[in-house]
Amino acid sequence: MNKSESLYAAAQQLIPGGVNSPVRAFNGVGGTPLFIERADGAYLYDVDEQAYIDYVGSWGPMVLGHNHPSIRDAVIAAAERGLSFGAPTEMEVQMARLVTSLVPSMDMVRMVNSGTEATMSAIRLARGYTGRDKIIKFEGCYHGHADCLLVKAGSGALTLGQPNSPGVPADFARHTLTCVYNDLSSVRTTFEQYPDEIAAIIVEPVAGNMNCVPPLPDFLPGLRALCDEFGALFIIDEVMTGFRVALAGAQSHYGVVPDLTCLGKIIGGGMPVGAFGGKREVMQALAPTGPVYQAGTLSGNPIAMAAGFACLTEVAKPGVHEKLTALTNQLADGLLAAAKAENIPLVVNQAGGMFGLFFTDAESVTCYQDVMKCDVERFKRFFHMMLEEGIYLAPSAFEAGFMSLAHTPQDIERTIEAAQICFSRL
C-alpha cells in the first residue's frame, strides 16, 4: 500500500467518501485518488513523490500555474497584517474597481466566498428584483450545490449518476425549469408556457461541467433576446470561464451582455472567492441598500482579496489570453492527430484555455445528450494510462480540462507523446 492509498483509507473513516468534494474520490474513473504534497508551475507532486503534468489546475483557478510568485507574495504580505477583520478594507475597493473595469457588464460587484454562493445569491437577487419565482437552467450545466440549482446538473452530479440530487425538496425543484443546452426552441417553449413567472435564465456560456461544450453561434444572443422579450434577467455563470476564455469572460468572446454575472475560481487566485455583479439598478436591490438579503462573515477576506487582485493583475497583462489559447490549440491539435493515427474516435472541444475530450464516433458534441452517448469506459482506461505516464487529467469524463500559462510547449509535447502511447493500447 502506497502513501496515497494509506491516507485514503484513513480519510474514508473520518470524511464522507474520504474527500471534501465528491469528484476528487475518483468514483468517475475508479481507483485511489492521489493525495498531493505540493504543486509548482504546471506540475503536481503527490505524497509518493511522483510528478504529474497537471491539466486540472485546482478545477480552473490556476490559470497562472501553481504557486505563482506574485500571488504567493501577496498572500504572505496580507497575512502579516491580519487574517480577517469582519470590516471593510481598502483592498475590497481596489478589487471591486479592478473586476468592474475588466468586465464591462458589471457596474457593481458583491464579493462572496465561492461560486456556489455567487450563483445562489444571483438567483435570489433576480427573484427579488423581478418578483418572480421560476428560473431556467440547462441540462448538464452545474451552478454549484444550492438546492434550486441541483436539478439535472452536471459536474459531480453526473459522475455520481444522480442528475437530480436527493435532499432537494420537490417544492424547490418545481421552480427550476430545465431546457436543452444549445436549443433555443426549448427555451422559447418554456417561456411561452410560463410567460410571467420566470425571473431569470442562468447559463454557463461554455458548459464546463458536462466536460467542455461551447455554445452554438446563435445560442447566447438568442437567450439574451428571449430574456428581453419576456422580462426575465439574463445571468451568465462565468465561475469557470471568467478571465479564462477571454479577459472579460466568455460574454465578451461571444458578444453578449448579461444582466448579472457570477464569478469564481480565477478571481481568487487559488483562494476561496466568488463574486456576482451586474447592472447598477439590479445590484442596488441588495441589502443594505435594498430588500434582497445576502451576507457573509468571511466575504471580502483580506488575504483572499490580495490573492485575487494579484492574480487578475497578471491575467490582465497583454498577450496572456493569446498565449493561453495557443497552448490549448497545440494540445487539442496534437491529441486529435495522435488519436487519428491509432483510429481512435475522438472529439476535442475547446474554448480559450478550456478543453474537453470525448471518445465518440459523432462529428460533434453540442449538448447533454451528445455527452451522455460518449464512451465513458474508454475514458476511464485512458485516464489511468495517462496517469501512469505522469499526466493528470480530470478524473471524470464529465469535467473540462484546463491549460495554464505555466505549461510550456515542451510539456504539451510530452503530453501528446504520452497520449500516443495510451491510444495505441486502448
Swiss-Prot record:
Please name the top-level EC class of this enzyme: isomerase
PROSITE patterns linked to this entry: AA_TRANSFER_CLASS_3
| Recorded GO CC terms | cytoplasm
Q: Which residues does the record list as N6-(pyridoxal phosphate)lysine (modified residue)?
A: K265
Q: Name the domain of life this protein comes from.
A: Bacteria
Q: What is its EC number?
A: 5.4.3.8
A Pfam family hit: Aminotran_3
**Cofactor (UniProt):** pyridoxal 5'-phosphate
Secretion signal: which residues?
none
User: Any keyword Cytoplasm?
Assistant: yes
GO terms for molecular function, please?
glutamate-1-semialdehyde 2,1-aminomutase activity; pyridoxal phosphate binding; transaminase activity
Q: Describe the reaction catalysed, as an equation.
A: (S)-4-amino-5-oxopentanoate = 5-aminolevulinate
Extract the InterPro entries matched here.
4pyrrol_synth_GluAld_NH2Trfase (IPR004639), Aminotrans_3 (IPR005814), Aminotrans_3_PPA_site (IPR049704), PyrdxlP-dep_Trfase (IPR015424), PyrdxlP-dep_Trfase_major (IPR015421), PyrdxlP-dep_Trfase_small (IPR015422)
Q: Which GO terms describe its biological process?
A: protoporphyrinogen IX biosynthetic process
> Which pathway does it take part in?
Porphyrin-containing compound metabolism; protoporphyrin-IX biosynthesis; 5-aminolevulinate from L-glutamyl-tRNA(Glu): step 2/2
Query: What family is reported?
Result: Belongs to the class-III pyridoxal-phosphate-dependent aminotransferase family. HemL subfamily.
NCBIfam families documented for this protein: hemL, PRK00062.1
Report quaternary structure and partners: Homodimer.
PANTHER family in alphabetical order = GLUTAMATE-1-SEMIALDEHYDE 2,1-AMINOMUTASE, GLUTAMATE-1-SEMIALDEHYDE 2,1-AMINOMUTASE 1, CHLOROPLASTIC-RELATED
Q: What is this protein called?
A: Glutamate-1-semialdehyde 2,1-aminomutase
| Organism whose genome encodes this protein | Pectobacterium atrosepticum (strain SCRI 1043 / ATCC BAA-672) (Erwinia carotovora subsp. atroseptica)
Which classification does the entry list for the species?
A: Bacteria, Pseudomonadati, Pseudomonadota, Gammaproteobacteria, Enterobacterales
